[in-house]
Amino acid sequence: MGRPLVGILLLLAMPVRSETLVEHGRYLAETIAVCTNCHTPRGPNGPLLDKKLGGGEVIKHQDFTAVVPNITPDRETGIGAWTDNEIMSAIREGRRPDGSLIGPAMPSRFYRGLSDEDVRAIVAYLRAVPAVHNPITAKSHYDRPLPASWGPPVGQVAEPPKDDKIAYGAYLAGPVARCMDCHTEQHNGLEAALGAGGKAFYGPWGVSVSANVTSDESDGIGDWSDAEIERAIRTGVARDGHKLFPPMPFTAYTGITADDMTALIAYLRSLPPRVEPAPLSGSGQAPGAAGSRH
Protein backbone atom coordinates (compact mmCIF):
# COMPACT_ATOMS: atom_id res chain seq x y z
CA MET A 1 0.00 0.00 0.00
CA GLY A 2 3.00 2.29 0.60
CA ARG A 3 4.03 2.73 -3.03
CA PRO A 4 0.59 3.63 -4.43
CA LEU A 5 0.12 6.10 -1.59
CA VAL A 6 3.49 7.74 -2.32
CA GLY A 7 2.56 7.98 -6.01
CA ILE A 8 -0.76 9.62 -5.20
CA LEU A 9 0.93 12.09 -2.86
CA LEU A 10 3.48 12.99 -5.54
CA LEU A 11 0.72 13.63 -8.05
CA LEU A 12 -1.14 15.81 -5.57
CA ALA A 13 2.03 17.78 -4.91
CA MET A 14 2.55 18.57 -8.59
CA PRO A 15 1.29 21.97 -9.83
CA VAL A 16 -1.99 21.62 -11.68
CA ARG A 17 -2.92 23.93 -14.53
CA SER A 18 -6.65 24.55 -14.73
CA GLU A 19 -6.50 24.75 -18.52
CA THR A 20 -5.39 22.14 -21.04
CA LEU A 21 -2.14 22.44 -22.97
CA VAL A 22 -4.04 23.51 -26.09
CA GLU A 23 -6.06 26.09 -24.14
CA HIS A 24 -2.89 27.53 -22.65
CA GLY A 25 -1.32 27.60 -26.10
CA ARG A 26 -4.37 29.42 -27.44
CA TYR A 27 -4.07 32.04 -24.69
CA LEU A 28 -0.41 32.57 -25.54
CA ALA A 29 -0.78 32.59 -29.33
CA GLU A 30 -3.96 34.65 -29.53
CA THR A 31 -3.68 36.95 -26.54
CA ILE A 32 -0.38 37.80 -24.90
CA ALA A 33 2.17 36.48 -27.43
CA VAL A 34 -0.19 37.39 -30.33
CA CYS A 35 1.24 35.04 -32.97
CA THR A 36 -2.06 35.65 -34.75
CA ASN A 37 -1.25 39.35 -35.12
CA CYS A 38 1.44 38.71 -37.74
CA HIS A 39 0.50 35.28 -39.10
CA THR A 40 -3.16 35.97 -39.91
CA PRO A 41 -3.78 37.67 -43.28
CA ARG A 42 -5.80 40.86 -43.28
CA GLY A 43 -8.50 42.26 -45.51
CA PRO A 44 -9.94 45.76 -45.75
CA ASN A 45 -12.02 45.17 -42.62
CA GLY A 46 -9.40 43.47 -40.48
CA PRO A 47 -8.06 39.94 -39.93
CA LEU A 48 -9.46 37.16 -42.15
CA LEU A 49 -10.45 34.75 -39.41
CA ASP A 50 -11.27 31.93 -41.83
CA LYS A 51 -7.57 32.01 -42.74
CA LYS A 52 -6.25 32.38 -39.21
CA LEU A 53 -2.48 31.83 -39.07
CA GLY A 54 -2.46 31.16 -42.82
CA GLY A 55 0.29 33.71 -43.50
CA GLY A 56 0.90 35.81 -46.57
CA GLU A 57 1.15 39.22 -44.91
CA VAL A 58 4.10 41.38 -45.94
CA ILE A 59 5.99 43.30 -43.27
CA LYS A 60 8.03 46.19 -44.65
CA HIS A 61 10.95 47.64 -42.75
CA GLN A 62 13.78 49.93 -43.75
CA ASP A 63 16.15 46.94 -43.61
CA PHE A 64 13.95 44.13 -44.91
CA THR A 65 10.71 42.98 -46.48
CA ALA A 66 9.41 39.89 -44.69
CA VAL A 67 6.74 37.57 -46.05
CA VAL A 68 4.91 35.92 -43.15
CA PRO A 69 4.61 32.11 -43.43
CA ASN A 70 1.63 29.82 -43.00
CA ILE A 71 1.88 28.13 -39.59
CA THR A 72 -1.31 26.05 -39.74
CA PRO A 73 -1.23 22.21 -39.91
CA ASP A 74 -1.60 22.17 -43.72
CA ARG A 75 1.00 19.64 -44.86
CA GLU A 76 1.69 21.28 -48.22
CA THR A 77 1.73 25.00 -47.47
CA GLY A 78 1.97 25.10 -43.67
CA ILE A 79 3.87 23.24 -40.95
CA GLY A 80 1.78 20.07 -40.85
CA ALA A 81 4.73 17.93 -41.96
CA TRP A 82 7.07 19.34 -39.31
CA THR A 83 7.78 17.46 -36.08
CA ASP A 84 7.09 19.05 -32.70
CA ASN A 85 10.83 19.51 -32.15
CA GLU A 86 11.18 21.19 -35.55
CA ILE A 87 8.40 23.64 -34.70
CA MET A 88 9.97 24.37 -31.32
CA SER A 89 13.34 24.95 -33.00
CA ALA A 90 11.72 27.33 -35.49
CA ILE A 91 10.12 29.31 -32.65
CA ARG A 92 13.00 29.46 -30.18
CA GLU A 93 16.05 29.22 -32.45
CA GLY A 94 14.70 30.67 -35.70
CA ARG A 95 15.75 27.55 -37.60
CA ARG A 96 13.65 25.78 -40.25
CA PRO A 97 13.76 21.99 -40.71
CA ASP A 98 15.97 22.46 -43.81
CA GLY A 99 18.53 24.30 -41.68
CA SER A 100 17.87 27.77 -43.07
CA LEU A 101 17.54 30.70 -40.69
CA ILE A 102 14.29 32.58 -40.13
CA GLY A 103 14.90 36.31 -40.35
CA PRO A 104 13.10 39.31 -38.90
CA ALA A 105 10.40 40.20 -38.11
CA MET A 106 10.35 36.83 -36.26
CA PRO A 107 11.64 37.82 -32.80
CA SER A 108 13.82 34.75 -32.28
CA ARG A 109 16.18 36.49 -29.86
CA PHE A 110 13.23 36.96 -27.48
CA TYR A 111 11.62 33.57 -28.09
CA ARG A 112 14.85 31.84 -27.02
CA GLY A 113 13.68 32.57 -23.49
CA LEU A 114 10.25 30.91 -23.82
CA SER A 115 9.83 28.21 -21.20
CA ASP A 116 9.62 24.57 -22.24
CA GLU A 117 6.02 24.42 -21.03
CA ASP A 118 4.95 27.51 -22.94
CA VAL A 119 6.60 26.54 -26.23
CA ARG A 120 5.05 23.05 -26.01
CA ALA A 121 1.65 24.66 -25.40
CA ILE A 122 2.05 26.85 -28.48
CA VAL A 123 2.97 23.79 -30.56
CA ALA A 124 -0.08 21.91 -29.24
CA TYR A 125 -2.28 24.86 -30.18
CA LEU A 126 -0.79 25.10 -33.69
CA ARG A 127 -1.51 21.40 -34.17
CA ALA A 128 -5.15 21.97 -33.18
CA VAL A 129 -6.08 24.95 -35.38
CA PRO A 130 -7.81 24.30 -38.74
CA ALA A 131 -5.41 23.75 -41.63
CA VAL A 132 -5.36 26.59 -44.17
CA HIS A 133 -4.14 25.82 -47.67
CA ASN A 134 -2.41 29.02 -48.69
CA PRO A 135 0.46 28.72 -51.18
CA ILE A 136 2.84 31.66 -50.69
CA THR A 137 5.28 32.22 -53.54
CA ALA A 138 6.79 35.56 -52.47
CA LYS A 139 10.08 35.47 -50.57
CA SER A 140 11.47 37.60 -47.78
CA HIS A 141 14.27 40.00 -48.69
CA TYR A 142 16.97 41.33 -46.35
CA ASP A 143 19.32 44.19 -47.14
CA ARG A 144 21.95 42.69 -44.86
CA PRO A 145 23.04 39.04 -44.73
CA LEU A 146 21.50 37.07 -41.87
CA PRO A 147 23.90 35.69 -39.25
CA ALA A 148 24.83 32.02 -39.14
CA SER A 149 22.51 31.58 -36.16
CA TRP A 150 20.68 33.52 -33.48
CA GLY A 151 22.74 31.82 -30.79
CA PRO A 152 23.64 28.36 -29.50
CA PRO A 153 21.00 25.62 -29.36
CA VAL A 154 18.40 26.30 -26.68
CA GLY A 155 18.44 23.83 -23.81
CA GLN A 156 15.86 23.48 -21.08
CA VAL A 157 14.16 26.72 -20.09
CA ALA A 158 12.23 26.93 -16.83
CA GLU A 159 9.41 29.39 -16.25
CA PRO A 160 10.00 31.95 -13.48
CA PRO A 161 7.86 31.40 -10.38
CA LYS A 162 4.55 33.21 -10.71
CA ASP A 163 4.66 34.38 -7.10
CA ASP A 164 7.70 36.53 -7.95
CA LYS A 165 5.70 39.23 -9.71
CA ILE A 166 8.66 41.23 -11.03
CA ALA A 167 10.55 38.20 -12.35
CA TYR A 168 7.43 36.72 -13.92
CA GLY A 169 6.46 40.12 -15.32
CA ALA A 170 9.92 40.40 -16.89
CA TYR A 171 9.35 37.00 -18.50
CA LEU A 172 5.99 38.11 -19.88
CA ALA A 173 7.32 41.47 -21.10
CA GLY A 174 10.37 39.79 -22.63
CA PRO A 175 10.13 36.33 -24.22
CA VAL A 176 6.32 36.11 -24.25
CA ALA A 177 4.83 39.49 -25.19
CA ARG A 178 8.10 41.10 -26.36
CA CYS A 179 7.10 44.51 -24.98
CA MET A 180 10.77 45.44 -24.75
CA ASP A 181 11.33 44.65 -28.43
CA CYS A 182 9.10 47.57 -29.46
CA HIS A 183 9.64 49.82 -26.47
CA THR A 184 13.45 49.85 -26.70
CA GLU A 185 15.25 51.66 -29.50
CA GLN A 186 18.34 49.89 -30.76
CA HIS A 187 21.25 51.50 -32.53
CA ASN A 188 23.55 49.12 -34.39
CA GLY A 189 21.95 46.22 -32.55
CA LEU A 190 22.64 47.64 -29.07
CA GLU A 191 19.85 48.42 -26.65
CA ALA A 192 20.24 52.10 -25.89
CA ALA A 193 17.76 52.24 -23.02
CA LEU A 194 15.52 49.37 -21.98
CA GLY A 195 11.89 50.46 -22.09
CA ALA A 196 12.63 54.09 -22.98
CA GLY A 197 10.78 53.90 -26.30
CA GLY A 198 11.55 56.04 -29.33
CA LYS A 199 11.33 53.27 -31.93
CA ALA A 200 9.46 54.26 -35.10
CA PHE A 201 6.91 52.05 -36.87
CA TYR A 202 5.47 52.68 -40.31
CA GLY A 203 2.10 51.36 -41.45
CA PRO A 204 -1.27 52.24 -42.97
CA TRP A 205 -1.87 54.48 -39.93
CA GLY A 206 1.23 56.56 -40.77
CA VAL A 207 4.16 56.71 -38.34
CA SER A 208 3.90 55.69 -34.70
CA VAL A 209 6.67 55.86 -32.14
CA SER A 210 6.89 53.56 -29.13
CA ALA A 211 6.32 55.23 -25.79
CA ASN A 212 8.62 55.34 -22.79
CA VAL A 213 7.34 52.68 -20.36
CA THR A 214 9.97 53.14 -17.66
CA SER A 215 9.30 54.61 -14.22
CA ASP A 216 10.44 58.08 -15.32
CA GLU A 217 7.75 60.49 -14.08
CA SER A 218 8.10 63.08 -16.83
CA ASP A 219 8.90 61.03 -19.93
CA GLY A 220 7.61 57.61 -18.85
CA ILE A 221 4.74 56.15 -16.83
CA GLY A 222 6.15 56.64 -13.35
CA ASP A 223 3.28 58.86 -12.22
CA TRP A 224 0.55 56.76 -13.86
CA SER A 225 -1.74 54.68 -11.66
CA ASP A 226 -1.94 50.92 -12.12
CA ALA A 227 -5.43 51.36 -13.55
CA GLU A 228 -4.16 53.87 -16.11
CA ILE A 229 -1.37 51.54 -17.21
CA GLU A 230 -3.81 48.65 -17.49
CA ARG A 231 -6.24 50.74 -19.53
CA ALA A 232 -3.48 51.73 -21.94
CA ILE A 233 -2.44 48.10 -22.43
CA ARG A 234 -5.94 46.66 -22.74
CA THR A 235 -7.74 49.41 -24.65
CA GLY A 236 -5.07 51.63 -26.22
CA VAL A 237 -6.20 54.73 -24.34
CA ALA A 238 -3.46 56.87 -22.81
CA ARG A 239 -3.57 58.59 -19.44
CA ASP A 240 -4.77 61.85 -20.99
CA GLY A 241 -7.50 60.04 -22.93
CA HIS A 242 -6.00 60.12 -26.42
CA LYS A 243 -6.10 56.97 -28.51
CA LEU A 244 -2.80 55.16 -28.99
CA PHE A 245 -1.71 53.89 -32.39
CA PRO A 246 -0.77 50.44 -33.76
CA PRO A 247 1.19 48.23 -33.97
CA MET A 248 0.41 47.52 -30.30
CA PRO A 249 -2.32 44.82 -30.45
CA PHE A 250 -4.79 46.27 -27.95
CA THR A 251 -7.66 44.07 -29.16
CA ALA A 252 -5.74 40.92 -28.22
CA TYR A 253 -4.46 42.36 -24.96
CA THR A 254 -8.00 42.79 -23.64
CA GLY A 255 -7.84 39.07 -22.82
CA ILE A 256 -4.69 39.17 -20.67
CA THR A 257 -5.48 37.55 -17.33
CA ALA A 258 -5.64 39.66 -14.18
CA ASP A 259 -2.64 37.84 -12.68
CA ASP A 260 -0.52 38.36 -15.79
CA MET A 261 -1.49 42.03 -15.93
CA THR A 262 -0.49 42.48 -12.29
CA ALA A 263 2.90 40.91 -13.01
CA LEU A 264 3.43 43.06 -16.12
CA ILE A 265 2.69 46.25 -14.22
CA ALA A 266 4.96 45.20 -11.34
CA TYR A 267 7.79 44.68 -13.81
CA LEU A 268 7.22 48.03 -15.55
CA ARG A 269 7.27 49.71 -12.14
CA SER A 270 10.70 48.15 -11.54
CA LEU A 271 12.31 49.61 -14.68
CA PRO A 272 14.76 52.39 -13.78
CA PRO A 273 13.67 55.82 -15.02
CA ARG A 274 15.16 56.59 -18.40
CA VAL A 275 14.69 59.35 -20.94
CA GLU A 276 13.71 58.45 -24.48
CA PRO A 277 16.88 58.31 -26.62
CA ALA A 278 17.31 60.80 -29.44
CA PRO A 279 17.25 59.27 -32.93
CA LEU A 280 20.46 58.79 -34.86
CA SER A 281 21.19 61.56 -37.33
CA GLY A 282 19.54 60.72 -40.63
CA SER A 283 17.55 57.84 -39.15
CA GLY A 284 14.27 59.29 -40.39
CA GLN A 285 12.58 58.60 -37.06
CA ALA A 286 10.16 61.03 -35.52
CA PRO A 287 9.95 60.35 -31.76
CA GLY A 288 8.14 63.62 -31.22
CA ALA A 289 5.41 63.04 -33.77
CA ALA A 290 2.26 64.36 -32.16
CA GLY A 291 -0.56 61.91 -31.57
CA SER A 292 1.41 58.95 -32.86
CA ARG A 293 2.50 57.22 -29.67
CA HIS A 294 1.86 53.58 -28.95
Language-model segments: which ranges?
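Electrostatic cytochrome c docking/interface patches
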Residues: 14-30, 147-175
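Extracellular/periplasm-exposed beta-strand and loop segments of Gram-negative cell-envelope proteins
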Residues: 135-141, 157-159
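Extended amphipathic alpha-helical interaction segments
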Residues: 156-157, 181, 188-191
